[in-house]
Amino acid sequence: LVAFHSAQMLSQKVIVVGSSGELRSSILNAKPGVKILLKPGEYEGGLFFQNVKGEPNNPIVISASDPTKPPVIKGGGECLHFSEVAYLEIHNLVLVDARYNGLNIDDGGSFDTPSHHIVLKNLQVRDIGPTGNCDGIKLSGVMNFRVENCTIERWGDGGQGIDMVGCHDGIISNCTLRFEDDKGFGIQAKGGSSNIRIVRCRLEHAGSRAIQLGGSTGLQFFRPPLKAGQEHAEARNLTVEGCTIIGSTGAIAFVGVDGAIVRFNTTYRPKRWAIRILQETREEGFVPCRNGVFTDNLIVFRSDEWAEGGVNIGPFTAPQTFTFARNWWFCLDKPEQSRPNLPVPEKDGVYGIDPRLRDPEKGDLSVLPESPARKVGAHAFVEAKRDK
């Protein structure tokens, strides 16, 4: 409490901290509506907190006192770990050099008390791991969440930039992930996750699977817990739209998911596949990977970076239930080889016509004004009225 009282209190609801001790005490004593502002500088990681709970319209906010000079939380097993929290917002921090995870938010292993109403905004997370299943942002048993304008770079070679296990009703928007083409995955939602949108994100060489819809989860980690006699899936009702994916062994992986929509995205030079359809969880009761919808996407590739016609289909899947429509496929070096090997016929697909990208070598994958592909890809995505 001494450190807590030594923190500069501007009012009942704003606390400015400048040391790791002040930060820890302020969070431990946080009440609904408090805003904890970190001065510029470096803070020691390895911070764990439980039951930090704001209230509706009265969240607890942890942020930078000066967003132009974001404080750095460095090191520890995890820079920050929160369990069983609610109405919590974390903004404008830099999280670096943790051994296992940059930011971990979970339900404390008690599946009937999920963390909920979480906002993560303007975070920079980098250099996590570097070996093993280590994540930039790890969410387990989290509901009603937003991850906005975050940048995640270099996570564990067996981990994810953003990993969601048993998470529901969330949106990941305007985030940027950067790594290498063949290390870990980018964004993943598995373990029973549902009703999650991934919107306007940019993934640059973000692992061997840039976006994984579903995955492979130990049965004991599903949230809600699996019940006998019901149909099971790694994930349901996931949507990816307006995203740009550069590189990666596989751009989009449907893995044991029952219902996912991928639309108005731009994929540029995947190293083997634009799409993977896989089933890795094969225990009794699990439905085959099915009901994927892939429409209005722009896929630009090279023939020497293209395997199996750009689509990899594994056993125990139901590729015949997928829908493909209005996608624009272009092979840079051999336009006549632009047609992909899809499991079912595509409706109104376009093959072999140059989309006229603006400046792909410099990372600008928008299209020129005269482009014939103006109506597909990430540049063509417009938020539906329901989201405004």
Locations of regions flagged by a protein language model:
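Bacterial N-terminal signal peptides
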Residues: L1-A3
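Right-handed parallel beta-helix/beta-spiral solenoid domain characteristic of secreted/periplasmic
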Residues: V14-G18, L37-P40, G45-G46, K53-G102, ...
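Short, polar loop/linker segments at the starts of domains and inter-domain junctions
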Residues: S25-N29, K74-H81, D364-V376
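Glycine-rich beta-solenoid repeat tracts in large extracellular/virion proteins
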Residues: L28, G46-N51, G77-E84, N101-T113, ...
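Acidic, glycine- and Ser/Thr-rich low-complexity intrinsically disordered tracts
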Residues: V287-N291, T295, F301-K388
